[in-house]
Every structure is written in C-alpha cells, then in structure tokens.
Amino acid sequence: MAVDIGKLVSEAKSVISIDALSGKTIAIDAFNTIYQFLSIIRQPDGTPLTDKDNRITSHLSGLLYRTSRLIENGTKPIFVFDGIPPTAKRKTLEARMSRRRAAHEAWEKSKSEGLLEEARMHAMASTSINEYVIGSSKELLRLMGVPFIQAPGEGEAQAAQLSRAGLADASASQDYDSFLFGAEIVIRNLTLTGRRKLPRKNVYVDVSIERIELKELLGKLGITLNQLIWLGMLVGTDFNQGVSKVGPKTALKIASSCKSLDEVVSLVREKYGYDFETDPIEIEHIFTNPDVEEIGAARFSEICSSFSVDKEGLVSFMCDKHGFMEDRVSKIADMLSSAGASRKQKGINSWL
C-alpha cells in the first residue's frame, strides 16, 4: 500500500501546466507509471491492448505516446526502475498478489455476465507487472533514446536521491511515499492528465498535473521529515500495516507530539494496544537510509548520454513486432531524433 496521506497534502498542492516543466529533468517512478498505463489503457470490458501474438501492449502505448508528448514539450524524463524490494515489503507484495488474483476472477465473471463497467473496474484492480512488461518497457525507452536507471532497491528512493543531489528537478509518482524517501519536489498526474470517469458513477473529473514541495508540506503540517516518516508508519506503508483506527489526522497529532520514534512506539502501544509487526527502527531506516546508488553529476551525465534514438529500431519494434501504426510511430521517431540532436548540440550536460 502506498502511504495514505493525501488529505494532509492537499493544501501544499499546486496545479501546473505541462509548460511549467519545459526544460526540467524529471525522475519518473517507472513501475508506478507503467502500472498506471496497464491499468487504464484498456478496452471497455477491461481487456488490455494486445498485439497479433496476444502480447500486452497497453504499457507500450502509454510510454510511447505520453513520454513523447513530454519530450516534445521540452521536458527531460529519466525513468527509474525498481530493483530488489526490502524484505519488510514481502507481506505487502503477497497481499497484492492475492487481491489481484481475486480481482482477475471477478473480472472474468463480470465479463461473462456482460457487466462491462464492473468488468473494467475489476480488470484495472487485477493489473500486475511481469518480466515481459519490464523488459519491453526498457527496450522501448532505449529505442526512444529516453534514459533509465536500474535502482538497486526502491525506485522511489533512487528518484529521491537524484532530486536531493540536484540532478533531477523533481520526482514523478502517484504515491506519496516519495516524500518519506526525501524527494524535494513531487509531480503527480504527469502522464495521466485529461478527463477521467469515476468508478460506478456517471461523473467525469479533470485530472491536472500537481506539484508538491516537501519543504512547503512540512511547513504546513508543522513537522520534520522524521515526523512525516513516523506519520506514514502510523497510517501504513509498504513495510507495515499501520495502526487500526488511526487515520492521517490522528497520526499527524501523534507524530507531531513525539520527539523520537521510541516515544511514538510507546504511545501507540499504550493507547491503541498496537505493536509494529516489523521492527519500527527497520522501517524508519528503509526511508532514511534506503538502498540506492549515490549518483553524482558525472555518472548522471554518463548515463543520460549513453542513450540515443534508434529510428529504424523504434519503428521495427513498435510496428513490425507489436502492430502499431507506422505513420504515427515514424512521426514520433522524427520528433525524438530532432530533440536528441538538439540536446547533443548543447553537450552531455544538457540533462542537468
């Protein structure tokens, strides 16, 4: 589960246009973004896009069209892929797998009964990322000339490291966990803008790009980063379930009143009879000392400059292999080549 602090973050959000990100380097949480593409780019009954060999292509569609739109607008994306998850995340991953299996069964049942809206909702909940999705996503990004980094651990943590090092202007993720890892600025809805229909309601909402700054968030909440981490632990993170009956507002009161993690642990044990199922010190350590590569400016430039557009390869991969329309892909390939040539003229540090 991603940490549920959305209600507390609302006052620190600002809505921005895509133009505001022109010239900015954005470290994108790859798994989070790809998951969104797989989830929403589906047919009315929830069936994902596939090619002639029945390989899923929803993620490729999202990566190609939405990433190219960012680049055309002058944004400089770099995707960060998850590595090996912390041991403490195992229970969360197992629970997710169980929920997705149940959702898949519900999807098949709803489809057979002709309940398209329910089928689509269950299909979205059944979304998962496998090795094919990861591999094909990396191959597409490579052919597009879009840099990506393989993080040793959590992708959000590595993206936050790039932010703190001044190598990325912001992290992009739908999850607020990025703040717990110390991301200084988080962009939400970067690739999800537009009108969205609310589940089971004939209501559409406009989804806009949001910008949230950690410093402003902490200031509005009146807490430190450590206290924000404790707050997250109280409502639940990917590494612990959280305290029953303690919502974000109560968690804020508890975290802001405590000066140490020991004090937080003692308070919730006495008041709520709650003991963390995972060592709370271990959870805190995951956020304060995550498993990341300490990337500096030279290494970052080396990574980014190693990627270049392969026009023929891109058309072959997307059109010959996966059945996308050649005229659209060719136009995107030309645009990416022009953008790449412009960056090359500016030198390898143009990503900084």
Annotate each PLM feature:
Residues 3-12, 16, 20-164, 184-186, ...:
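Noncatalytic, basic helical substrate-engagement surface that gates or grips nucleic-acid strands
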Residues 12, 16-25, 202-352:
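Non-catalytic nucleic-acid-binding/docking modules located in mid-to-C-terminal regions
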Residues 37, 89-90, 182, 190, ...:
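Intrinsically disordered, low-complexity regions enriched in proline, serine, glycine
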Residues 47, 126-277:
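Nuclease catalytic cores that cleave nucleic-acid phosphodiester bonds
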Residues 73, 172, 279-281:
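A short, structural micro-pattern
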Residues 98-99, 168-169, 187, 346-347:
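Short alpha-helix boundary/capping motifs
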Residues 109, 115, 198-202, 345:
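Intrinsically disordered, low-complexity linkers and terminal tails enriched in Pro/Gly
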